[in-house]
Curated annotation (Swiss-Prot):
The gene is murF. It is found in: Cytoplasm. Involved in cell wall formation. Catalyzes the final step in the synthesis of UDP-N-acetylmuramoyl-pentapeptide, the precursor of murein. Pfam families: Mur_ligase_C (PF02875), Mur_ligase_M (PF08245). Belongs to the MurCDEF family. MurF subfamily. It is an enzyme of class 6 (ligase). NCBIfam families: murF (TIGR01143), PRK10773.1 (NF008041). One of its GO terms (biological process) is cell wall organization. It comes from Buchnera aphidicola subsp. Acyrthosiphon pisum (strain APS) (Acyrthosiphon pisum symbiotic bacterium). ATP binds at residues 107-113. It catalyses: D-alanyl-D-alanine + UDP-N-acetyl-alpha-D-muramoyl-L-alanyl-gamma-D-glutamyl-meso-2,6-diaminopimelate + ATP = UDP-N-acetyl-alpha-D-muramoyl-L-alanyl-gamma-D-glutamyl-meso-2,6-diaminopimeloyl-D-alanyl-D-alanine + ADP + phosphate + H(+). This is UDP-N-acetylmuramoyl-tripeptide--D-alanyl-D-alanine ligase. Its main location: cytoplasm. Keywords: ATP-binding, Cell cycle, Cell division, Cell shape, Cell wall biogenesis/degradation, Cytoplasm, Ligase, Nucleotide-binding, Peptidoglycan synthesis. It comes from the Bacteria.
Length: 455
């Protein structure tokens, strides 16, 4: 991070400094990550208060603290009204002191994948930081921005939310030069109430956008008309898998196979053949988004192609695992909502052999959760999937609708049954999916263990 003094931090946060002034080169919020000489910010959440860890931080030679309480440690400290807000204020100051181009991403699905693709491309052209994992909330975004140094050329920041107001806050801290709303789908409906609520929350990203900046819009998500007033002074780039006529970036010659996807990408600078180490149409869309981001920064198409190919596979997101010859496991257990479930079905039906979807509940869908699960059952009936196994309160609605489904009450019985099917079939593809809370990765782990027994 950019070094700053405790006096400066007190000024930025409207806090009061007690003790000597020091130069700070590292800020931490987790005592497990403390290094000698760092500043520890004691955050307070709904279920925790980091002030109780200050004694531990002192033992590890923390140099100073930002607190909400007059704890009087034997080192300098700053008292502020709200430590979480103070963290954001410091991060916002650091962001303003760098010349890095900041790219901000939000949307219902694919944020992390687009972030990884974009960062992979930009690293071919200069020093780049990006959101670690999916730490995209009011704490994760400031912690990412604090990594910025003068030598950084780009920052790729993921902005997530589970309720209104959160993205407006992180966007204003980030002050992005280029933004993307990747898509709008039925996700986190408990917090946003409706699809319109999701759209309004994601559009909060415009609040921090600089004048005459660039906005990237997915024309396959039908909410552009609601955002026109927010982006009238911005440059706009459009991408789409379906709407070639109006798009700056679109694709043709799509081929999906067990190891990834290939297609021809059409851009304002011509067309180029692209290969991705990822499965699924949604990752084609994500690649178009990442390419539009990079194009806005004048990155050549050849570097975009190489960056996309070199993107690391994101764990538990349509991750293809060859267990045995002709036996494929697709781990898509990171999360689940209506759109990503439909995408998973489309991927599975293109895979070889006997096709089984194993699903847990899609969480946070609000009062219409049953209807959405039934909709997935109907979608699966129109696909080439052979079998669905479900577990969870709501996922039983999927197997009730699907013509060849079986519901389980616990993961142990599900895993045992699935292992038997796996052993009997000579050619099979199994896709496992569920919301984070369902912990469907346990089913994946059991299948991998079973496969290793045979080796």
């Amino acid at each position: 991070m950019i070094s700053l003094s405790l006096k400066k931090i007190a000024l930025i946060t409207n806090g009061t400094l007690y003790g000597a002034d020091l130069l700070i080169n590292e800020i931490v919020i987790d005592t497990k990550k403390i290094i000698p000489g760092c500043l520890f910010i004691a955050l307070i959440g709904r279920k925790f208060d980091a002030h109780i860890f200050i004694h531990d931080a002192l033992k590890k030679k923390c140099a100073a603290f930002v607190t909400q309480k007059n704890i009087k440690p034997h080192v300098p400290y700053i008292i502020v009204e709200n430590t979480s807000i103070a963290l954001g204020q410091i991060a916002g100051w650091v962001r303003k002191k760098t010349k890095a181009k900041i790219l901000a991403i939000t949307g219902s699905c694919g944020k992390t994948s687009v972030k990884e693709m974009t960062a992979s491309i930009l690293r071919k052209n200069g020093n780049t930081i990006s959101t670690i994992d999916n730490l995209n909330n009011n704490i994760g975004v400031p912690m990412t921005l604090l990594q910025l140094k003068q030598e950084h050329k780009y920052g790729v920041i993921e902005l997530g939310a589970s309720k209104p107001g959160e993205i407006a806050y992180t966007s204003n801290i980030s002050q992005p030069d280029i933004i993307l709303i990747n898509n709008i789908h039925c996700a986190h409906l408990q917090g946003f109430k409706s699809l319109l609520g999701v759209s309004k929350a994601k559009s909060e990203i415009f609040s921090g956008l600089k004048p005459n900046s660039t906005v990237i819009i997915n024309l396959d998500s039908h909410h552009f008309s609601q955002w026109k007033k927010d982006i009238k002074n911005s440059n706009i780039l459009f991408f789409s898998i379906k709407k070639k006529k109006y798009s700056n970036f679109f694709c043709s010659n799509i081929k999906i196979h067990i190891h990834g996807t290939s297609f021809t990408m059409h851009t304002p600078c011509g067309k180029i053949n692209i290969s991705l180490p990822f499965l699924g149409y949604q990752n084609i869309s994500n690649a178009l988004a990442a390419s539009a981001f990079s194009f806005a920064l004048k990155i050549p198409l050849k570097k975009i192609k190489i960056g996309l190919l070199d993107t690391p596979i994101v764990s538990k997101r349509l991750e293809s695992i060859i267990l045995e010859p002709n036996k494929i496991l697709i781990d898509d257990t990171y999360n689940s909502n209506v759109s990503s479930m439909i995408s998973a079905i489309k991927v599975l039906e293109r895979m070889p052999g006997y096709k089984i979807l194993v699903t847990g509940d899609m969480a946070e869908l609000g009062e219409n959760s049953m209807m959405y699960h039934q909709m997935i059952g109907n979608t699966a009936n129109s696909s080439a999937i052979n079998k669905i196994f479900s577990i969870g309160d709501m996922s039983s609605e999927i197997t009730k609708i699907f013509n060849n489904g079986k519901h389980f009450l616990n993961k142990k019985k599900l895993s045992e049954y699935l292992k038997n099917v796996f052993l009997k079939k000579k050619k099979i593809t199994i896709l496992v999916k569920g919301s984070r809370s369902t912990k469907m990765e346990k089913v994946v782990e059991d299948l991998i263990k079973e496969s290793k027994k045979k080796c």
